[in-house]
């Protein structure tokens, strides 16, 4: 009986240490996506141009694998270019 208690205690101790030592899972986007340079405007991210100027300039000027555009919030043509250092997906 004492051996079973010690074994159970050892298993729980090991499980606790494994859980405590696991690295935190952080949002991948924070490491991968960096802003190119403020409000770049709609023409920089125009959907008819492929790949976009955002994608091309992130690769050429920032050494990123690609670039993505996001809406910059309220306002007509408010767009933000995010350089992607993890994926080349436009």
Swiss-Prot record:
This protein's name: Defensin-like protein 193
Protein keywords: Antimicrobial, Disulfide bond, Fungicide, Plant defense, Secreted, Signal
One Gene Ontology term of the molecular function aspect: serine-type endopeptidase inhibitor activity
GO biological process, alphabetically ordered: defense response; defense response to fungus; killing of cells of another organism
SMART domains xref list: Knot1
Similarity comment text for this entry: Belongs to the DEFL family. Protease inhibitor I18 (RTI/MTI-2) subfamily.
Subcellular location: Secreted
Annotated site (Reactive bond): 48-49
Pfam family, one: Toxin_3
Keyword Disulfide bond: yes
Predominant place of localization: secreted
Signal peptide: 1-27
Species whose genome carries this gene: Arabidopsis thaliana
Entries under SUPFAM superfamilies matching the protein: Scorpion toxin-like
Presence of keyword Signal: yes
Cystines in this chain: 32-86, 45-69, 54-81, 58-83
């Amino acid at each position: 009986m004492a051996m079973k208690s010690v074994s159970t205690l050892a298993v729980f101790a090991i499980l606790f240490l494994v859980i405590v030592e696991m690295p935190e899972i952080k949002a991948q986007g924070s490491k991968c996506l960096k802003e190119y340079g403020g409000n770049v405007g709609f023409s920089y991210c125009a959907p008819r141009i492929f790949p976009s100027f955002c994608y091309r300039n992130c690769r050429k000027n920032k050494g990123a694998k690609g670039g993505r555009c996001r809406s910059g919030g309220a306002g007509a043509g408010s767009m933000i270019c995010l350089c992607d250092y993890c994926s080349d997906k436009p």
